[in-house]
Swiss-Prot record:
Region (Disordered): 43-207, 313-359
Record bears the keyword Cytoplasm: no
Glycosylation sites: N257
SUPFAM superfamilies from the UniProt entry: Kelch motif (SSF117281)
Localization: Membrane
Name of the protein: Kelch domain-containing protein 7A
Superkingdom of the organism of origin: Eukaryota
Source organism: Homo sapiens
């Protein structure tokens, strides 16, 4: 039932009021939605010209708020979208310069600013928001006039990023850090000082530089240029950007080889804030933070004479964040309370693995030598693994410094800085770690002085070279014989070891027959002093086999070695069993330890393997005690002691023992030696003195050849120098001339050993002459 009269009129009035309210609300909602859709639409790519600037100007005037225009560098094209900006902010302009006739190629970015802030409508007037100064990055001379301040350079070579709604302003923090080594001084080095760019300006965080490969005019040049970008703050957010690039040049004068390295860090931090319209005490800003990080490393390596524009940089991204944080560098004048922070350079990034160029990286090899003396020939005593057959073409001559502290061979090759003149050869110090590489290089370069120095090191350390397959295995047969003969150069001397077990002391003395004087040679280590020890020389080394050591006279199997060319004592492989009072002889490059107390076994030492092995023992029905042994014609002869009437002969080729011609008498045999194919046996008689018997290899018969009349002769031991047999005792030293026709004792009595403390053990060593300097390794 419809209302009538006054009720109907009131009802119609109420319906009209309700409809108006509903229609007004719907219209307001539609307008709001349309406005939001209009404001949130993606901005089209803006052209670089007057149209784009006019559009930005109109939008800025309509909103009443200044905007910041940003252009991202090429490496950040995939990052977040940037805010639309007003005419106040500018984008970096591209600059490309390639001069075919010039010494360099430069590709970088340039910027210019045209800041004229305007505000209309409800926007609040603010002034003094930063400086209108700008920065003109380095450019080539052909485009220097086009990139001047206030000009409009050519369009850039990278697209502009999109924009976002003005209702959600953002703050952006971007930084880049890079370093580039190599090249020549740029034409802008002496230009006018750089100025700070305007607010909101952002430049590419990295530029590509291609430096010349052949630089001989300057040495060790370096420069650094930095670009710092300002900051523009708004009421609800901030846009902050910073960009810097470091360029350092290290170029050696006249160097045909160059290495270029470029590393950069780009970090983008974007803060998106939303404004709360409601009044109250709750926070007015809420937003999101986007953090992006990009690190790239590049390297270009060139060898020889190449064209100036053939460099190729390889980027290696790294997922690790930079070690330091980057902040803002400048603040807006009108909003000083909203801006804070300081510009801070990030630390140098950790670069990825370097690419290999032409087989191996020259950066990891040539640039390590100056700061790593292990790769040079100057230090003493270092050990460096030597490849058996190094690459002949991989040994350069010179090197530059580097920042890498690690030392490692590159492509299996070690590099050395060596003198190329004979006058500088005496200053070189080699060791066993580099002698073969230096020898190979010296033979290739025909450097006789350096080759002789390498042979000298090998000969003075022959035992170590013999045990090293990387050195001895690569030498030819002639070179092996050469280093051995070089070790035996010099003059043979009678060397006597005075061993005193009671005082645990001992020493070596050599006898100078020209001046009839004894000279001290070296001290024996306490470990090598023992009772009943034996000595022998092999390859001009003195070997000492221990006897009984300590107060309890415990048998010892230790063996020691002395190098007279370097003056160094060392310990070698011990015996398989202790042998006090054994006889030690050298035959065919091996040592033989024969018998000992209550022993008839024999051991053989191989110096190349540093190992003792058992050899065929003496015949089972013999008992070797206080015997003597010598070597003749690659055979070992043993007699004396309990073998008074027997003579045993050992053949190293057949590895067996034979019984020789029966000899000897009731007198005690003191010593037996071999000279010029004859065996000489010295027997002691208390009443008659010393009787000398000789046996030839052809007749194999013993006969008396000489006597020395003296009552109660002292015991002695013999050593042979040329054709002289020295009989060394505690109280006297006799000399016997082993002449093939008329063997005899020398009438002149020699000077006795000075103040003997213990047992005297003679041997023969070849000592260098005083005018030959020795190398201690």
């Amino acid at each position: 039932m419809f209302p009538r009269g006054a009720e109907a009129q009131d009802w119609h009035l109420d319906m009209q009021l309700t409809g108006k309210v509903v229609l007004s609300a719907a219209a307001l909602l539609l307008v709001t939605v349309a406005y939001r859709l209009y404001k949130s639409r993606p901005a089209p790519a803006q052209r670089w010209g007057g149209n784009g600037q006019a559009e930005a100007k109109e939008e800025a005037e309509g909103s009443g708020q200044p905007a910041v225009q940003e252009a991202s560098p090429g490496v950040l094209l995939r990052g977040p979208r940037r805010r639309r900006s007003s005419k106040r902010a500018e984008a970096p302009q591209g600059c490309s310069c390639e001069n075919p006739r010039g010494p360099y190629v430069l590709v970088t970015g340039a910027t210019s600013t045209d800041r004229k802030p305007q505000r209309k409508g409800s926007g609040e007037e603010r002034g003094g928001q930063g400086s209108d100064s700008e920065q003109v990055p380095p450019c080539c001379p052909s485009q220097e006039t086009r990139t001047a301040v206030g000009s409009n350079p050519d369009p850039p070579h990278f697209p502009r990023l999109g924009s976002e709604p003005k209702s959600s302003p953002a703050g952006l923090i971007a930084a880049a850090d890079g370093s580039c080594a190599g090249g020549e001084p740029s034409p802008w080095q002496d230009s006018k000082p750089r100025e700070h760019p305007g607010l909101g300006q952002l430049e590419p965080p990295h530029c590509h530089y291609v430096a010349p490969l052949q630089g001989s005019s300057d040495m060790n040049q370096s420069w650094v240029f930095t670009r710092v970008i300002g900051v523009s703050r708004e009421e609800a957010g901030a846009l902050e950007a910073a960009s810097d690039v470091d360029l350092t040049l290290h170029q050696q004068e006249g160097a045909p080889n160059s290495s270029y390295t470029f590393s950069s860090i780009a970090r983008v931090r974007m803060e998106e804030h939303f404004i709360q319209k409601a009044e109250g005490v709750e926070p007015r800003l809420k937003g999101k933070v986007y953090d992006y990080y990009v690190e790239s490393t590049s390297q270009a390596i060139f060898q020889g004479r190449l064209a100036p524009r053939t460099a190729a940089l390889t980027e290696v991204p790294s997922p690790r964040p930079p070690p330091g944080s980057l902040g803002t560098g400048a603040a807006s004048g009108g909003q000083a309370g909203d801006t804070k922070g300081a510009a801070e350079r990030a630390a140098s990034p950790q670069t990825g693995p370097w690419p290999s160029t032409r087989g191996f990286s020259r950066k990891e090899s040539l640039l390590q030598i100056a700061e790593n003396p292990e790769l040079q020939l100057q230090p003493d005593g270092f050990r460096l693994p030597a490849p058996p057959c190094p690459d002949p073409g991989a040994l350069p001559g010179l090197g530059r410094s580097s920042r890498e502290p690690h030392v490692q061979p590159v492509a299996g090759t070690n590099f050395f800085h060596i003198p190329l003149t004979p006058a500088s050869a005496p200053q070189v110090r080699l060791d066993l770690g580099n002698c073969y590489e230096v020898l190979t290089l010296a033979k290739r370069q025909n450097l006789e002085a350096l080759k002789e120095a390498a042979y000298k090191v090998m000969s003075e350390n022959y035992l170590q070279v013999l045990r090293s397959p990387d050195i001895y295995g690569c030498l030819s047969g002639a070179e092996r014989e050469l280093i051995l003969q070089r070790r035996l150069r010099g003059r043979q001397y009678l060397v006597v070891a005075d061993v005193c077990p009671k005082e645990d002391s001992g020493g070596l003395c050599c006898y100078d027959d020209e001046q009839d004087v004894w000279r001290p040679l070296a001290r024996m280590p306490p470990e090598a002093v023992s009772r009943g020890c034996a000595i022998c020389s092999l390859f001009n080394y003195l070997f000492v086999v221990s006897g009984c050591q300590g107060p309890g006279h415990q048998p010892s199997s230790r063996v020691f070695c002395y190098n007279p060319l370097t003056g160094i004592w060392s310990e070698v492989c011990p015996l398989n069993q202790a042998r006090p009072h054994c006889r030690l002889v050298a035959l065919d490059g091996h040592l033989y330890a024969i018998g000992g107390e209550c022993l008839n076994s024999v051991e053989r030492y191989d110096p190349r393997l540093d190992r003792w092995d058992f050899a065929p023992p003496l015949p089972s029905d013999t008992f070797a005690l206080a015997h003597t042994a010598t070597v003749r014609a690659k055979e070992i002869f043993v007699t004396g002691g309990s073998l008074r009437f027997l003579l045993f002969r050992f053949s190293a080729q057949e590895q067996r023992w034979w019984a020789g011609p029966t000899g000897g008498s009731k007198d005690r045999t003191a010593e037996m030696v071999a000279v010029n194919g004859f065996l000489y046996r010295f027997d002691l008689n208390r009443s008659l003195g010393i009787a000398v018997y000789r046996c030839s290899a052809s007749t194999r018969l013993w006969y008396e050849c000489a006597t020395y009349r003296t009552p109660y002769p002292d015991a002695f031991q013999c050593a042979v120098v040329d054709n002289l047999i020295y009989c060394v005792g505690r109280r006297s030293t006799l000399c016997f001339l082993a002449d093939s026709v008329s063997p005899r004792f020398v009438p002149k009595e020699l000077r006795s050993f000075p103040a003997p403390q213990g047992t005297l053990l003679p041997t023969v060593l070849t000592l260098p002459t005083p005018d030959l300097p020795q190398t201690r390794v």
